[in-house]
Design a protein with these regions (language model features):
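Mg2+-dependent prenyl diphosphate-binding active-site environment of isoprenoid biosynthetic enzymes
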Residues: 1-141, 179, 205
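Residue-level recognition of alpha-helical structural elements
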Residues: 17-20, 49, 78-81, 139-140, ...
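A short structural micro-motif
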Residues: 30-31, 91, 149-153, 166-167, ...
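Short, charged, amphipathic alpha-helical segments
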Residues: 86, 175, 198-202
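Short amphipathic alpha-helical boundary/capping segments
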Residues: 132, 189-190
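Mobile late-domain/C-terminal helix-loop "cap" segments
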Residues: 140-188
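Short, amphipathic C-terminal "tail helix"
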Residues: 180, 185-186, 193-212
Length: 212
């Protein structure tokens, strides 16, 4: 199904001209590169947080950036506005993924319909986990031990999730998410005040603060 959808998207973009096809191809390359990096551990000597954020820029940011770029391009905007919207879209995409990661940790399953701790069980180091692993407080030693081990066991997963939810790393990850949202809104500064600008600003708030 994914291949079919990608093929249909390519068919539609082909009707928009050579530049649109090139933009789609470049986004696809970034997406694939991001997925490859996501499937591999952070290289020794690299900062795990910077590595992870780079993955999100490629995997998710590139897609939303392309959508925003297309909207501005085919809406007749100037080149400056097209670039502005692409940058806005990229940060919106990163903020969306960061917020989604937090939902997996801190949300109420009865509200979201999602099972908390799915990423932990699968060994995915999201931003809050990376922050927790970087911690040095002796009181958090048990959490760091759990996060560095296998969490497929239900009891270990439940313990790790409870400890992580109470750890400052979650709020730190939330602050980072909001900071990315602030960057996205700031990029809209040069645009004239309008309903469209207000909607783009509100969209960032909705993405950053969502709970499910």
């Amino acid at each position: 199904v994914g291949d079919l959808l990608f093929g249909k998207a390519s068919e539609l973009v082909a009707g928009l001209g050579a530049e649109a096809v090139l933009i789609q191809a470049q986004a696809f390359v970034r997406l694939c590169a991001g997925q490859i990096r996501d499937d591999r551990p952070c290289p020794p000597g690299d900062d795990p947080v910077d590595y992870y954020l780079g993955v999100l820029h490629d995997k998710t940011g590139s897609l939303i950036a392309t959508a925003a770029r297309y909207g501005a391009m085919f809406g007749g905007c100037s080149d400056d506005v097209v670039e502005l919207m692409a940058a806005y879209g990229e940060r919106l995409g990163v903020a969306f993924q960061l917020a989604d990661d937090l939902i997996d940790i801190a949300s109420d399953a009865t509200e979201t319909g999602k099972t908390p701790g799915t990423d932990l069980r699968e060994g995915v180091d999201t931003l809050a986990v990376l922050y927790a692993k970087q911690g040095t407080d002796p009181a958090d030693a048990r959490l760091r031990e759990l996060l560095s081990g296998d969490l497929r066991d239900d009891d270990r997963l439940a313990e790790a999730l409870a400890l992580l939810q109470a750890n400052p790393a979650v709020e730190r990850a939330r602050e980072t998410t909001r900071a990315v949202g602030v960057e996205a809104v700031a990029l809209l500064g040069p645009l004239p005040e309008s309903d469209a600008k207000a909607a783009l600003t509100a969209l960032v708030t909705s993405v950053v603060e969502r709970v499910g």
